[in-house]
Amino acid sequence: MDSSVIQRKKVAVIGGGLVGSLQACFLAKRNFQIDVYEAREDTRVATFTRGRSINLALSHRGRQALKAVGLEDQIVSQGIPMRARMIHSLSGKKSAIPYGTKSQYILSVSRENLNKDLLTAAEKYPNVKMHFNHRLLKCNPEEGMITVLGSDKVPKDVTCDLIVGCDGAYSTVRSHLMKKPRFDYSQQYIPHGYMELTIPPKNGDYAMEPNYLHIWPRNTFMMIALPNMNKSFTCTLFMPFEEFEKLLTSNDVVDFFQKYFPDAIPLIGEKLLVQDFFLLPAQPMISVKCSSFHFKSHCVLLGDAAHAIVPFFGQGMNAGFEDCLVFDELMDKFSNDLSLCLPVFSRLRIPDDHAISDLSMYNYIEMRAHVNSSWFIFQKNMERFLHAIMPSTFIPLYTMVTFSRIRYHEAVQRWHWQKKVINKGLFFLGSLIAISSTYLLIHYMSPRSFLRLRRPWNWIAHFRNTTCFPAKAVDSLEQISNLISR
């Protein structure tokens, strides 16, 4: 394709969040003219950011996307490695469950700082222009036209070759695509909300072990804590909304934490706990699925706009960043031909993003309940053992999702296959132990004892002579044995 044509391509990126700003970097490298429209003010100058601010877990997929635009080292240097889950039981006991091998870890990063860094990186490209406080009013993908409303309150029509919807779970771009025939959409609010709390530094250092994702699992709800660069921890309490609604006073909150998170109170402090708890109401969590992710060659959805997921597998940002990376790889493959790239992008990403959405739902149950069980710990130890002796044959689900770029839906399929293999292996092992035990029992048992086992009615005589079994009960058993022997 002629380079002058490529340079004339104009792209409107709707949304200047994590995925939107990263996608602007990817597209700017292709010499497209990029305009990013963000409804909020510039987060780098905002005095207070309201709403979602859950700490993020950056893993392999996200790092590969950042690496492709030359930002991996910068972002990684601002993250804190977390090598394992640290489980806090109700009794105060702590136990670590490694994520993978000693060299494998995820990174705790600040959403706010990461967004600022990505915006700054995008603005460094001369062909990128940021438009803050610009809200999308209309989107007409057939004609490649959008209407935006800036701070001057005057609607402005903008024409472009490609509209990229990166405007989050409540995407305006997606809402316009939903009016098109054969566009499928579903959403689900889970019955749990989240609330953020803070564990401040203690004597200038971390109040807990910093290189862990701390979890307080309590079956129907849980709390997690991720470390920050300033030696604090950001805690997130996930709980059904009806439970949040029961905590109306300061005493209610303190009593609740004393009952379910007693070891967290001295870490947070009662005063700060109450202050943070009533600062903002519990926030909802939504899961969104749609199909397809594109419309002709003029519009595409990325990140939460295409597949908002609950945060319990730590893959929301990573999946969104991988969207950008896959899109970039396809643009290379098809030489920037959007008519070829967009349909393949939808075909590849829809099964993967739906798979990680389902896994995230499943992982909430695992995090809040299963991690307490001995069987769960046994399974994790077995997975690590099998992976150690057969690294290319047996790969734990978490490793496939977090430390590789195996496609999400393929990871799920492989996980189900591996579970079947393990279950069959355990059944075979159990059967072998049972048969071996029976053989040894028979082989070393005296003939007289063996004869008693073969003839159940002889047991009755044995009970009559050696126990204080009631006589009437023995007589009843004799009657049954006589029927059996006939």
From Swiss-Prot:
Pfam family, one: FAD_binding_3
Binding site for FAD: V19, Y37, E38, A39, R40, A57, R111, L136, T172, D304, M317, N318
Catalytic reactions of this protein: L-kynurenine + NADPH + O2 + H(+) = 3-hydroxy-L-kynurenine + NADP(+) + H2O
Keyword annotations from UniProtKB, A to Z: FAD, Flavoprotein, Glycoprotein, Membrane, Mitochondrion, Mitochondrion outer membrane, Monooxygenase, NADP, Oxidoreductase, Pyridine nucleotide biosynthesis, Transmembrane, Transmembrane helix
UniProt note: pH dependence: Optimum pH is 7.5.
Chief site of localization: mitochondrion
Protein origin, superkingdom: Eukaryota
Annotated GO biological process: 'de novo' NAD biosynthetic process from L-tryptophan; anthranilate metabolic process; cellular response to interleukin-1; cellular response to lipopolysaccharide; kynurenic acid biosynthetic process; kynurenine metabolic process; L-kynurenine metabolic process; L-tryptophan catabolic process
Result, substituting N465A: Not glycosylated. Reduces to 80% kynurenine 3-monooxygenase activity
Cofactor(s) the protein needs: FAD
Pathway note: Cofactor biosynthesis; NAD(+) biosynthesis; quinolinate from L-kynurenine: step 1/3
Transmembrane segments: 385-404, 425-445
Effect of M367A: Strongly decreases kynurenine 3-monooxygenase activity
Effect of N363A: Strongly decreases kynurenine 3-monooxygenase activity
Entry function: Catalyzes the hydroxylation of L-kynurenine (L-Kyn) to form 3-hydroxy-L-kynurenine (L-3OHKyn). Required for synthesis of quinolinic acid, a neurotoxic NMDA receptor antagonist and potential endogenous inhibitor of NMDA receptor signaling in axonal targeting, synaptogenesis and apoptosis during brain development. Quinolinic acid may also affect NMDA receptor signaling in pancreatic beta cells, osteoblasts, myocardial cells, and the gastrointestinal tract.
Family to which this protein belongs: Belongs to the aromatic-ring hydroxylase family. KMO subfamily.
Additional observations: Increased in neuroinflammatory conditions. Inhibitors are investigated as potential neuroprotective drugs since they lead to an increased level of kynurenic acid, a neuroprotective NMDA receptor agonist.
Annotated domain remarks: Transmembrane domains are required for enzymatic activity.
Name of the molecule in the record: Kynurenine 3-monooxygenase
Organism per entry: Homo sapiens (Human)
